[in-house]
Amino acid sequence: MLQQLLITLPTEASTWVKLRHPKAATERVALWEDVTKMFKAEALLSQDADETQGESLESRVTLGSLTAESQELLTFKDVSVDFTQEEWGQLAPAHRNLYREVMLENYGNLVSVGCQLSKPGVISQLEKGEEPWLMERDISGVPSSDLKSKTKTKESALQNDISWEELHCGLMMERFTKGSSMYSTLGRISKCNKLESQQENQRMGKGQIPLMCKKTFTQERGQESNRFEKRINVKSEVMPGPIGLPRKRDRKYDTPGKRSRYNIDLVNHSRSYTKMKTFECNICEKIFKQLIHLTEHMRIHTGEKPFRCKECGKAFSQSSSLIPHQRIHTGEKPYECKECGKTFRHPSSLTQHVRIHTGEKPYECRVCEKAFSQSIGLIQHLRTHVREKPFTCKDCGKAFFQIRHLRQHEIIHTGVKPYICNVCSKTFSHSTYLTQHQRTHTGERPYKCKECGKAFSQRIHLSIHQRVHTGVKPYECSHCGKAFRHDSSFAKHQRIHTGEKPYDCNECGKAFSCSSSLIRHCKTHLRNTFSNVV
């Protein structure tokens, strides 16, 4: 297959393919696809030129002969590649589908421009869903002796001490001669007039056009540009193929340059290939497009923090982390909310704040479908489903869902109560507790039920009350299956199964499972004491 592909290519493309040494069948498919797309673009270009040049009779005659010769010489065999049974078996299903799509597309394009009249056998096989591989001797209909002789000519030229420029100028493409819109320009390039004079007679005898000097080619190319308004200019877009080779997409038309169009195509192709270079971390195998990103990533593994704050001495691994930190010292808050005018140090903080105005809650729990405006809110909520309490108090061992609850709890052990009520001088460990307490003096009840209008001083009390209307009982006993609206009711019920009685009477030592039962029991002692006094 590789020998066949090299024969159907011009010298520049043949040299470019050989330098890459494609061995596997998948590699050859990718290279073949790239080249066939160039063939299609040039075939369509010939048709466009015929349509756009209708002004003068002379130009119509010239283009008519050019199109006729192109139709005769550019056939489906020129843009197709066949496989042996062994090569076809090496292709993955995705590569086989790719081959089938491109072959059918190539045939359709040639039919549309009148370059293909009869349907090849491989197209019939592909349309029927059959495997298109051929016997070794039947590939492309090329006799084995002819194939070997043509291949040997080019391989021997590569092995001799001939420069790439001489090879480029000296070798002619055997199949595509005068009249092919793609290779007519390539066929006229030569290194110098000396090479032209040595090879002219031999080529004329074979029906090939003589090679001309680059100066002559440039003049003819300028005249050709005047006749044709549109020329192909390849715009490369890197698309990862089956083996990571670049493919070409989106061909556009533009004014031609002074160099060979196919040469420009190969240059752009090579540049696209170099752009695909990536950088991989040797430790975690993470891949980066730029070396500077890999350098920054490596500091995670090495622990290096080269960027240090001059105010407090805190160090950072990236300069982008140091800049927001310095705003703490300068007080700068460059990110402002357009709705309320509130400012923030970080753009992420502004984004989270804006969701308060928009009501957006992009983070949704998959278990209960509850939504949150911040990811941390979803993480904390998920712990309620799995009953995970990762934050543990070092003094008493009590665990909490959130770290702020742990911080609030730790104040109990220290005994610090910095928040004092101005009315009754009662002290509290948290500002929220003080705020809730002050509502007992003011009588404020800001949380109102939408169903019945009942108001509450705390949000938690409203949430518990709403379960009366919804009928939700989230606390279920694992022993008997009984459900409860309140966690306090659930805790009392659990003591029935465990037999726990934490409430003891100071008079007689009798124990009870509920505080209300202890209160009722204590009243019996009071009645007895009162009756004895009387």
Swiss-Prot record:
Q: What InterPro entries does the database record attribute to this sequence?
A: KRAB, KRAB_dom_sf, SCAN_dom, Znf_C2H2_sf, Znf_C2H2_type
Q: What is this protein's expression induced by?
A: Up-regulated by Golgi stress-inducing agent nigericin.
Q: What is its main location?
A: nucleus
Quote a single Gene Ontology cellular component term: nucleus
Show the GO MF annotations: DNA-binding transcription factor activity, RNA polymerase II-specific; RNA polymerase II transcription regulatory region sequence-specific DNA binding; zinc ion binding
The family line of this record is: Belongs to the krueppel C2H2-type zinc-finger protein family.
Q: What is this protein called?
A: Zinc finger protein 69 homolog B
The species is Homo sapiens (Human)
